[in-house]
Design a protein with these regions (language model features):
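Short acidic-hydrophobic, aromatic-tinged amphipathic segments that line or gate anion-handling sites
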Residues: 97-99
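STAS-typified acidic loop motif
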Residues: 2-31, 50
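Amphipathic alpha-helical interaction surfaces in cytosolic regulatory modules
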Residues: 23-95
Length: 99
């Protein structure tokens, strides 16, 4: 099961995710992530360095997050090749900054 920590540095809200971001995990963390984003609507980074798996619920969370800030102000970084490939296949790379 996954979890996250967050920090704000130089105006950028960064979420550091770990583990498997499955449906149950996303149901538990989704509101926490979105509530923090509502307070900080500038630049947001989802750091996926410690993530092994994402479910469609995490993709939905990304969509909800993008609706709170301008999509050009949200980035997904440090993901493994498989996750990056899947996000690109479904078109999320065209909407969010995926690095």
């Amino acid at each position: 099961m996954g979890n996250f920590t967050s920090s704000v540095d130089t105006g950028i809200l960064t979420f550091f995710f770990e583990g498997e971001l499955d449906t149950i995990c996303c149901m538990e963390i989704g509101d926490k992530v979105l509530n923090q984003m509502k307070e900080h609507k500038e630049k947001v980074v989802f750091d996926l360095k410690g993530v092994d798996y994402i479910s469609s619920s995490f993709i939905r969370l990304c969509g909800s997050a993008a609706s709170l800030v301008t999509s050009s102000n949200i980035s997904l970084v440090n993901m493994n090749k498989e996750i990056k490939k899947n996000l690109t296949k479904i078109g999320l790379a065209a909407v969010l900054n995926i690095k």
